[in-house]
């Protein structure tokens, strides 16, 4: 169960503890880890997502983008091999989108975490993703690189998607 971590689309549906540190510590605490190991995991996860300076802040005092980062940190504190995210850029301004997508790419490239995300924002795909799957009504229509998948415009239209701007 620790191999896969899930991050919800809306961080307000995932966060529940009063402070950032308490929220990120929740998962490791429930694993029965030592206080030192929990503190180490919390510090490491907050550092990975750039939220170390906010560790003692109230969750309610954070911006939407900061809350998304805390959700990711909470999952990272569980040391997953796979991170599944539902619309991680939803509700973010362009700078926030770039920041979150860069973070996810770094988690994959530097830490070996497999990133799986659901998104309708096809413009992100060629820039940040090595492989993708196009789904429609629960069925996988095509799997491959962005170039392979987006070369079949009929399938893209069938899935009610548009081609990325850079395609």
Language-model features, listed with the residues they occupy:
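Conserved ABC ATPase signature
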Residues: 58-62
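A short, surface-exposed alpha-helical micro-motif characterized by mixed small hydrophobic
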Residues: 125-127
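Conserved catalytic motifs of ABC-family nucleotide-binding domains
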Residues: 79
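Conserved ABC ATPase "signature" region
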Residues: 36-54
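Catalytic Walker B motif of ABC-type/P-loop ATPase nucleotide-binding domains
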Residues: 83-86
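H-loop/switch region of ABC-family ATPase nucleotide-binding domains
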Residues: 119-120
């Amino acid at each position: 169960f620790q191999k896969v971590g899930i991050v919800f689309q809306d961080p307000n549906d995932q966060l529940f503890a009063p402070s950032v540190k308490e929220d990120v510590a929740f998962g490791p605490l429930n694993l029965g880890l030592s206080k030192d190991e929990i503190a180490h995991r919390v510090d490491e996860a907050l550092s990975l997502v750039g939220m170390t300076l906010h560790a003692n802040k109230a969750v309610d005092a954070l911006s939407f983008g900061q809350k998304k980062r805390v959700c990711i940190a909470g999952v990272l504190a569980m040391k997953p091999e796979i991170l599944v995210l539902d619309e991680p850029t939803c509700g973010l301004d362009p700078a926030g989108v770039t920041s979150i997508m860069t973070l996810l790419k770094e988690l994959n490239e530097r830490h070996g975490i497999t990133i799986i995300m659901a998104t309708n924002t096809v413009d992100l795909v060629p820039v940040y993703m090595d492989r993708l799957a196009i789904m429609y009504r629960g069925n996988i229509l095509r799997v491959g690189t962005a170039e392979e998948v987006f070369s079949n415009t009929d399938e893209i239209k069938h899935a009610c998607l548009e081609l990325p701007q850079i395609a």
